[in-house]
Amino acid sequence: MAKLLMFHGRECPHCHRMMPRVEKLETETAVRFEKHEVWHDEANQELMRSFKDVLKPKCGGQLRVPTFFNTETKDALCGEVEYEKLKDWALKQ
């Protein structure tokens, strides 16, 4: 299975609304996300920046949270999305 990352911010309201969707997806499927808080963790910020050339074009030209990233296919899903969209994205990987 592909390695899926979730970049999020501790105080980000969009990230907070996505967490139950992520948890539901992990409970209902074999999908697992490696979660990285980037607002207060410099190592996680560096990790996210290391993918900036791939993430920025897919995320409106900027690095933002929440962002979901597949390290194998280099596909990204950016922002707050409905559960079904997250599920479809994660399972197609």
Language-model features: where?
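Extreme N-terminal starter segment of soluble prokaryotic enzymes
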Residues: 1-5
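Typically the conserved alpha-helix immediately C-terminal to a functionally engaged Cys/Sec
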Residues: 16-30
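Cys/His/Pro-rich metal-binding microdomains
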Residues: 13-16, 69
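Aromatic-flanked redox-active Cys/Sec active sites in thiol-based oxidoreductases
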Residues: 6-12
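Generic recognition of short, well-ordered alpha-helical segments
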Residues: 16-20, 46, 81
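Non-catalytic, surface beta->alpha helical segment in thiol-disulfide oxidoreductase systems
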Residues: 64-93
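Thiol-based oxidoreductase modules, predominantly thioredoxin-like and allied folds used
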Residues: 7, 30-48
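Structural micro-motif
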Residues: 52-69
